[in-house]
């Protein structure tokens, strides 16, 4: 089996700690499966890159990422770098655009049923919640034409979507739905009662599913209505949820409170359909860099589960990815948890426990 090259971009603050724990788990796989070899290449991104090079994404980091099988990212940003002309988050936007990472996948479920009581929503309401937000990541208002206030007292941002952009994200959602038997339902979220871009979105999603995936069902929901359903009846959205860049950013962050901690939720950003389990992708936790958190207190589970997604979708190591997810469930069920989950364990203790569990599962 050829060596798998993983570019590691720790980023800022807790980013270094959480990527270290994910690497620990990946090395545990190497230990019990000698035929599997990972080549980890570390590079700078975000505030750490600004401090060292003056730019949030150095050329060497971008070039290495383009040549890798996958990218594992920690977290970027922090108050130290403020909101000036050069910001850590620009590194993230640039790498997404340069690597054409057009689809962001964010699962929302419970890594373990033992966590149900930690949700801020009643356990009986959230039990069984299981959906994936498929967010369009390189179009829409975040990448549209913008005009800063130049002293005139007026600023603007432009939301633009084209037919091909909506078609390819719809195909990604359809592919994800078809990985299940029976296929999962698709929910498309927009603001078609107000926005022209949303009316195009709704039309193209409908046409693409009807013409290319007649075996699938798609239901359209206005984003504000969906935001209410997500809290009141989250299981109604079970399946695949597809939406635009900004709406996906907001709704996936809202969904992240359901399992009780951002420290549990992974994400994948893909440049193509994972139809061969070898799609190029960037994997990162849904949480930020947590600059106020003391050392060894951050929950590494989201990053470890991001590595599990990487194994399944980019590295053609599906069995090993499932083993990591199973190990996480075992560790959480055993009560080994960080403070955000009402536990007393450190970052490294949780990582150690998952690594040991993975070894036992794969041995």
From Swiss-Prot:
Biological or metabolic pathway of the protein: Amino-acid biosynthesis; L-leucine biosynthesis; L-leucine from 3-methyl-2-oxobutanoate: step 3/4
Cofactor(s) recorded in Swiss-Prot or TrEMBL: Mg(2+); Mn(2+)
Top enzyme class: oxidoreductase
Cross-referenced SUPFAM superfamilies: Isocitrate/Isopropylmalate dehydrogenase-like
GO biological process annotation, one example: L-leucine biosynthetic process
Disulfide bonds: none
Classification via SMART domains: Iso_dh (SM01329)
Compartmental location: Cytoplasm
Domain of life: Eukaryota
Residues annotated as binding substrate: 96, 106, 135, 224
Site (Important for catalysis): 142, 191
Subunit architecture: Homodimer.
Family note: Belongs to the isocitrate and isopropylmalate dehydrogenases family.
PANTHER family given in the database record: 3-ISOPROPYLMALATE DEHYDROGENASE
Role: Catalyzes the oxidation of 3-carboxy-2-hydroxy-4-methylpentanoate (3-isopropylmalate) to 3-carboxy-4-methyl-2-oxopentanoate. The product decarboxylates to 4-methyl-2 oxopentanoate.
Protein name: 3-isopropylmalate dehydrogenase
């Amino acid at each position: 089996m050829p060596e798998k090259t993983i570019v590691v971009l720790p980023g800022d603050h807790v980013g270094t700690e959480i990527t270290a724990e994910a690497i620990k788990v990946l090395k545990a796989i190497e230990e019990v499966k000698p035929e599997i070899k990972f080549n980890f290449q570390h590079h700078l991104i975000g505030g750490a890159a600004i401090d060292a090079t003056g730019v949030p994404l150095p050329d060497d980091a971008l070039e290495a990422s383009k040549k890798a099988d996958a990218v594992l990212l920690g977290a970027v940003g922090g108050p130290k770098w403020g909101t000036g002309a050069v910001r850590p988050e620009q590194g993230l936007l640039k790498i997404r655009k340069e690597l054409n990472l057009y689809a962001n996948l964010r699962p929302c479920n419970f890594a373990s049923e033992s966590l149900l009581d930690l949700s801020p929503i009643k356990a009986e309401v959230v039990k069984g919640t299981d959906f994936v937000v498929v967010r369009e990541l390189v179009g829409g208002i975040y990448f549209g034409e913008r005009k800063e206030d130049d002293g005139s007292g007026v600023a603007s941002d432009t939301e633009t979507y084209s037919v091909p952009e909506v078609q390819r994200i719809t195909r990604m959602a359809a592919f994800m739905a078809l990985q299940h038997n029976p296929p999962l339902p698709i929910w498309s979220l927009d603001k078609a009662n107000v926005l022209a871009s949303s009316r195009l979105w709704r039309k193209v999603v409908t046409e693409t599913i009807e013409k290319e995936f007649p075996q699938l069902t798609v239901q359209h929901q206005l984003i504000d209505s969906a935001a209410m359903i997500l809290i009141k009846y989250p299981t109604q959205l079970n399946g695949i949820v597809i939406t635009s860049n900004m709406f996906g950013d907001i709704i996936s962050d809202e969904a992240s409170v359901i399992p009780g901690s951002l420290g549990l939720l992974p994400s994948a950003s893909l440049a193509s359909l994972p139809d061969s389990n070898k799609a190029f992708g960037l994997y990162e936790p849904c949480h930020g860099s947590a600059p106020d958190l003391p050392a060894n207190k951050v929950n590494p589970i989201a990053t470890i589960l991001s590595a599990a997604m990487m194994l399944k979708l980019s590295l053609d190591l599906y069995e090993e990815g499932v083993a990591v997810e199973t190990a996480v469930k075992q560790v959480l069920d055993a009560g080994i948890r960080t403070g955000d989950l009402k536990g007393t364990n450190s970052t490294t203790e949780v990582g150690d426990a998952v690594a040991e569990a993975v070894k036992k599962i794969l041995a």
